[in-house]
Amino acid sequence: MSFQRHKKHVISISLGSSERDAKATVVLGEQELLVERRGTDGDFAKARQLMEECDGKVDAIGLGGTDLFVYAGDTRYTFRESAKLIAKVRNTPVLDGSGLKNSLERRLIAKLAAEKIVDFKDKKVLLVCGVDRFGMAQALQEAGAKLTFGDLLFGLNVEKPLYSLESLAWWAKLLAPIVTKLPVSWLYPMGKEQQKRTPKFSKYFLENDVIAGDFHFIRKFMPESLLGKIIITNTVTESDCKMLKQAGVKLLITTTPCLNGRSFGTNVMEALLVAVKGAKSSLTAAEYIELLERYEIESSFEYLND
């Protein structure tokens, strides 16, 4: 029996580099989806224009290169600059990946531990930014990892590593009302800055066994050698994989699956799942997990060096 696939369109509009643009066709069940990523090289006006042009013409929009929200304990703060990007989008759901991160990444860490792919017990883990991956942070702690959070190191250029979820939550509650009003570019590499390497606070990379979190932070600040390290991240291209291999990375784990030779950002995957569901807003954690399991969407593992 044949069927007519219902084609849907998901687009991620990113403040990141246009050099990382990609396009892929994905089939989930009986639905075919065109998934694409378009970077604006840090141009907020262009990103806002693209958002408004796509409103009502695609099934879901991913917001990349920035976060819309950050969480401090149970309080959610909105990045003022990011909110302006989507202020006039009325008809198409916009997803920044935060809704999916908690469920997808928590599930991944539990799976890695359960299947003994990575034994986190007493393993030293650097999470380059914990506030945008609190679910991953909690899962790592539950798995027995010894955590170092790089939020102040890499986000604010302050040499103060944090070593517990409690201290991370305390600092987040103190600083979130302030930093969410600052230009995003002060906190996060975007546009051409994503392609520049400026190693910083290298000792925290070197003294940890696992480096986890946002790849743009990892790529920008990592030292030349990461011999024997495990990287848990997302949004890597083929050239990124080659760079990590040359750096001596042992195992690369991407939280999102590879499509056409690269892993897309969490915002893309969240938008894809919302589009498949036909929803007009973000889903619940249970709904995300159900869709991930139904369509057998799995993370990617690649041993780069023996």
Name each model feature, range by range.
Residues S18-A22, V70, G135-M136, N157, ...:
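Short, charged/polar "capping" segments at the starts of alpha-helices
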Residues T66, G130-R133, F215-I218, T235-S239:
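Short, polar loop motifs at secondary-structure junctions
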Residues L156-Y163, D240-A247, G261-V268:
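Short, charged, surface-exposed secondary-structure boundary motifs
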Residues N157-F217:
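Active-site rim beta-loop-alpha module in soluble metabolic enzymes
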Residues F221-E224:
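Short, T/G/N/S-enriched strand-turn elements that build extracellular solenoid repeat scaffolds
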